[in-house]
Swiss-Prot record:
NDH-1 shuttles electrons from NADH, via FMN and iron-sulfur (Fe-S) centers, to quinones in the respiratory chain. The immediate electron acceptor for the enzyme in this species is believed to be ubiquinone. Couples the redox reaction to proton translocation (for every two electrons transferred, four hydrogen ions are translocated across the cytoplasmic membrane), and thus conserves the redox energy in a proton gradient. Keywords: 4Fe-4S, Cell inner membrane, Cell membrane, Iron, Iron-sulfur, Membrane, Metal-binding, NAD, Quinone, Repeat, Translocase, Ubiquinone. The gene is nuoI1. Gene3D superfamilies: 3.30.70.3270. This is NADH-quinone oxidoreductase subunit I. InterPro entries: 4Fe4S_Fe-S-bd, 4Fe4S_Fe_S_CS, NADH_quinone_OxRdtase_chainI. It comes from Pelobacter propionicus (strain DSM 2379 / NBRC 103807 / OttBd1). One of its GO terms (cellular component) is plasma membrane.
């Protein structure tokens, strides 16, 4: 036996057919389609596919996170102390650090022997920058051309991360960046 509820809405035949809702949905879809079609016919920008190599996106947010940078100390060595906090907090597991001991330096007994970031896995979340206790890793605001045809070019080594200078970044000055700004691609 089917239960009857006291607050059950009663629907007549017109409500159960949903004709009004179907027509309303078709009107919304049609208006968006024909609006975009009109923009396309009049050579204005509509909600169409951007053809990547020919059309580059220029409307990035001011809070955009770009390529990673390793800061350096006054003596030219990397500021990283190989604590692995950035690699631990990374949700994509794209940072690989291999530590080396330097017993001659009493203030920085550990330094990275190998520091690499796999950009094919990086999601540019910025957690590594927030987790670093030494402010050794930063992210530029530039949007360099990342896509490539092989995965070897998607790995950023320690030398590249230390020597790559962003073309423009008004957020902070970078320690040890007395050179002219130049862009170095992997």
């Amino acid at each position: 036996m089917k239960k009857e509820y006291w607050n059950k809405p009663t629907m007549d035949l017109w409500d159960r057919l949903y004709i009004f809702e179907v027509i309303r949905g078709l009107c919304i879809t049609g208006s968006v389609f024909f609006g975009n079609m009109w923009k396309w016919l009049t050579f204005r920008k509509g909600a169409l596919t951007a053809y990547y190599p020919e059309e580059l996106r220029a409307d990035y947010s001011s809070a955009n996170r770009g390529r990673h940078l390793l800061t350096t100390r006054a003596d030219g060595k990397v500021q990283c102390v190989s604590c692995n906090m950035c690699a631990t907090v990374c949700p994509a597991y794209c940072i690989e650090i291999q530590s080396a001991a330097d017993f001659n330096d009493p203030f920085h007994p550990k330094s990275p022997d190998r520091f690499e970031i796999d950009y094919s896995r990086c999601i540019f979340c910025g957690f590594c920058v927030e987790a670093c206790p030494e402010d050794a890793i930063r992210m530029s605001k530039d949007t360099p051309n990342f896509p490539g045809f092989d995965r070897e070019n998607m790995w950023a080594t320690q030398d590249l991360l230390m020597n790559w200078q962003p073309a423009s970044d008004a957020a902070k000055s970078y320690p040890g960046s007395g050179q002219a700004h130049q862009e170095v691609h992997p």
